[in-house]
Every structure is written in C-alpha cells, then in structure tokens.
Amino acid sequence: MSDNWVVQNLQKSLSTWNDKLAEVWKLLTQSPEDFKGGAIWKVITDIHGALMAIGLALLVLFFVVGVVNTFGSFAEVKKPEHALKLFIRFAIAKGVVTYGLELMMALLEIVQGMVSAIMKASGIGSFDKITLPKEMVSAIEDCGFFESIPMWAVTLIGSLFITVLSFIIIMSVYARFFKIYMYTAIAPVPLAAFAGQPTEQIGKSFIKSYAAVCLEGAIILLACIIFSVFAASPPAVDADAAPAAMVWGYVGELIFNMLVLVGTVKMADRIVKEMMGL
C-alpha cells in the first residue's frame, strides 16, 4: 500500500466497498437456515411453532365466520355440495397452516434456484474488486504539499460517500433477510385466514408479499451483475489533467456508478411489487 495519505484513504474506502459487495454476493446465495450459523433461524422456528396453536384457533374462528357470512341458514350448510366445499376449504387451510413453514421454504428454494441459474448464466461467479488506477496513484504521489491540499478535501468527501454507500447496500440485503425471518415467524396467523371466504384475501396478500420478498434476492443479484459488467471498464483517467481534477473526475464518476447500483438495490422491493402487481 502507498505511503501517501490521499491514496491510503481512497484505497481503504474502496476496500470497504469491495468487502461489503463481496458479502452481498455471499448473502444472496445463502439460506436463512445457515445465516449467522443458524442461531437466528432456530429462534424463528421456535416462535413459528409457538404461534401454531394461535393459528389453529384462528383457523376455526375464520372458518365459522366464513360459514356464517356465506350461508343464510344452517339448512344450506347441510347440502352435500356446500358441505363438501366447506370440508375441502377447511382441510386445505389446515394443511397450509400446519405445513406453512415447509411451503414457505419450498418457495424460497425456488427463488434460490433462480438466483443460482442467473449467476450461472451470467458467467460471473464473484464480484471484481475496484482498485485505483496506477497512473492516478503515481500522479498523487508526485504532488507536493500545497498541491495535495485540494485533493485532501476531494478524498475526504469521496471516501465518505463510498463508505456510506457501502453500508447502505449491505443494510438493504440484511433487511431482506430480516423480512424473511419476520414473515416466517408470524406465518401461522395470516395463513389461518384461508379458512374463511371473507378473510382469504389476508392469506393471499401474505403469500404474495412473502414471494415478493424472496424475489428481491433475484433483483438484487441482477443489479450486481449489471454493475459488474458496467464497472468492468473503470472510469477514464485524464493523464493530462491536474492531479486534483484527475481525482475529482475519477471519484465523481465512480460514486455515480455506485449510486446507480445502490439505488437499484434499494428499489428492488418496488420493482418486484410492480412486476407482481402488488
């Protein structure tokens, strides 16, 4: 590493960006069961199991409410065709609540398969690290004390932006994991709504929202792949420009590229909702 403070500061901020983006790449292919050693998943499954009793109680309640609202009298309920429909609805709702965790994991595995397929088709197995161009490092190191003063300000601002963007993008990916955990933990309660016709929309909305959260991973991966190809050609460095102008031009274009990626990742949930009509 260079002994120049300006170069060191820029290299450290780029190292933070590279580390966070590598972590994003790893998290997108990781299952919630393996996240942080599986300790969080164990707590979530325990909560899911504890709420199962409440979900089954609500299942009966929603079923009764649905019967009362749908049929005008008990005589209609006793008709074979109506009784069969009610039995099938209750059985399906009971199965959805009881095996809700397995169904949700199956849906997540489908999306994880999509992520693996996208990664394989793109031919990109990891993210290429961003490094400072050698000609820019040489130009900065050749500057005198007074020539370096403008670059200090540019470097401080640029490094701050890059570091903040690094944490924003990793927080967005962590937020997706936490949303999956929350959906999984309380799943028995909204899934019980399938038992009644008036309340079944709650269950449908829950499934759609959960599917959208899962699909966010594929959208984030696509954004990272596009950025990887886009950033394969680093910002051009004007060798004839003054060192301060050279650093400003390079850092400015680099931050713009990063903003595009971070903005796309932050909008992943909105993109999925627009795709699914939510």
Tell me the role of every PLM-derived stretch.
Residues E23-K26, H82-R89, E109, S116, ...:
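Short amphipathic alpha-helical coupling elements at transmembrane boundaries
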Residues L191-K208, D240, I271-M275:
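Alpha-helical transmembrane segments
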Residues L58-K94, I186-Q201:
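Hydrophobic transmembrane alpha-helix segments characteristic of membrane transport
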Residues K94-I186, C224-G277:
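Non-cytosolic segments of integral membrane proteins
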